[in-house]
Amino acid sequence: MEEYKDAHFTLRLFKAVLNLPQFKNYSAGIVVQAYLPDAYDFQTELLEFAKARVDGGGAPIKMRLVKGCNLEMETVISSLKGWPNPIRPSKTEVDANYLCLLERGLMPENARVLHLGVASHNLFSIAYAYLLAQKYGTTGYMTFEMLEGMANHLWRAQSMLGNRVILYTPVVKNEHFLNAVSYLVRRMDENTAPDNFLTHSFNLKPDTKEWDFLAKQFEEAYAMKDHLTHVSPRVQNRNLPYTPVAPSDTMQNEPDTDFDVSQNQEWVRRIFAKWKKSGTEEPEIIPLQIGAETVVCKNRYKYLDRCQNDEVCICEMSQADSAQVEKIIEIAETDPAGWRKTTLEERHRIMYEAANRLADMRGDLIGCMCAVTGKTVIEGDVEVSEAVDYARFYTTAMKKFAALDDIEIKPKGTILVISPWNFPCAIPVGGIVAGLAGGNTVILKPATVAAPVAWMFAKAFWDAGVPKEALQVIITNREALKVLTTAPAIKHIILTGGTD
C-alpha cells in the first residue's frame, strides 16, 4: 500500500484473499500509512474484518503502522495531475494521526484480533506505544519494527525491556544495486529533513535544545490526536455536473480523472454500460456537414466497436465527394458568419465556453474513443484533459502576444486540419483551436477511422458559439481529399500523421 493509487485496491485484495477457505488460519499482515487521512478508515475496515474472522474461528491478522514512505512521489504526482495531495498537510498532523491509530490499535478488544506492528525510530512514539501497551495489557500483541543500521541503540534498549523487535534489512545483489539507489536516496532525504527525529537524535539527552524540540513536537501531536478529521481530500466525482471555468488570462491545466476513488470507478462502469452496443440497435447515421446544413450521403463509412469481438456497428458517417468538398471550401473562404471579424476577446470567451463543454462531455468522449479506436479509458481521459487545455491555452497565449508592442494579429484565411487516428481528440482539437483562436475558418478532416470522435467534440465548439460555417468537419475519399488539399483557398494546413 505504498502508493496511494494502490491503497484501496490493496486493502480489498488483502481481504478477498484471506476470505478464501484455505487461508482461514493463515496469519497475514498489511501496512497502513498514518500520513493518509484515509488511514483511520483503513484501520476501521481492518478491525471489522479481523473481528469477524476471529469470531468465525480464523486467525488474527496484523497491521503494520508507519508514518508514511512515499511523500515526495505523492506530492509530485498530485501536482502533475492537478489533484489534491492525499497526504496530511503537516508533520504535526501526521504524528497526531499516528498516535491516534496507536491508541486505538492497542485497546484490548482491537489488539487481540488485529495485532500491531509499531514501525518508528522516534523515541517518543516508541515510548508512547510501550506505555499504552503496558496500560492496556496488550504487549503480547505488539511488535516494534525498525530498520537495521538506522538507530541500533533504540532496538537494543527495546530488547533489554523484553519487547519483541523486528529488524528490516534491505538486501540487494551487486548487479542490481542501481535499483536500490532510489530507496537509498529516499532514506537519506527523510533522515536529514529538519523535522525528522533522526536528524536530532545524535547525542540526544534530556534538557538539551534537541530534546526540547522533539518533546514539544510530540506534545503538539498528542494535543491534536483527538481533534483530527479523517476525510480524504481526494473527492473528485465525475458523476456530478462539471463546474464551468470562467474566462481568464491565467492558464490553469484541467485535472485528469482520479481513478483511485470509488465514485469515479463507478463513473467508468456507467460509460461502459452506455457505450457497449448490443448490435440490435440501429446504428447512428452521422451526416455530412456543409456549412450550417447537413446531408446524409449514400457513401458512408461504417464503424465497428473495437472493444468487442463481435462485429457490432456503432455508427455510419457520410463521406463527401469532390463537388461537396468544393462547396465546403467555398463556405469556409467566404465566411458568411463573419468569424474573421470577431475580436480576440470574443474568441477567448467562446474558446473557454468550448473548453467547459468538452470537459462536461468527458465521459462520452472517452466512451467514443474506446469504442471507435480501441483506446483504454486512461488513454482517452488524458486526451480530453489535453483538449480542454488547448481550448483555453491558445487565446490566453494570443492575448499576451497581442499586448506586445509592434504586434498585429491577422487571420490567414482558411485552415485545413488533418489529424491522425491514434490521438483522435487532443491533436485535432489543438489544430482547430489554433486556427479558430487566430480568427481563421477551419475545415477539419480527421482520420476516417476515428472521425466520430471529431464529430462529437465539434458539437462542443458549435454549442459554445463557433458558427458551423467557421468549423466544418468532413471525411472524404482519396479523390476528394486531393481537391481539398490542393485548393488555393486553403491558406495553411496543419497535418499530423499519415496520408489517410
What are these regions, as identified by a protein language model?
Residues L13-L20, F42-F49, L101-P108, Y128-K135, ...:
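Generic, well-ordered alpha-helical scaffold segments in large soluble proteins
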Residues M1, S27-A28, P84-R88, N110-H115, ...:
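Glycine- and acidic
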Residues A96-E103, A127-Y130, R156, S182-Y183, ...:
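Feature representing long, continuous alpha-helical segments
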Residues C370, M398-D500:
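Rossmann-like NAD(P) dinucleotide-binding subdomain of oxidoreductase/dehydrogenase enzymes
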Residues N163, N174-E330, T334, K341, ...:
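Terminal low-complexity tails and localization/encapsulation signals of metabolic enzymes
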Residues M1-E2, V31-Q33, R64-V66, H115-H121, ...:
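Generic beta-strand/beta-sheet core signal
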Residues M1-N253:
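Positively charged, amphipathic and often flexible ligand-engagement surfaces
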Residues Y4-K51, P336-K412, F423, I427, ...:
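Long, K/E/R/D-enriched contiguous segments that form extended
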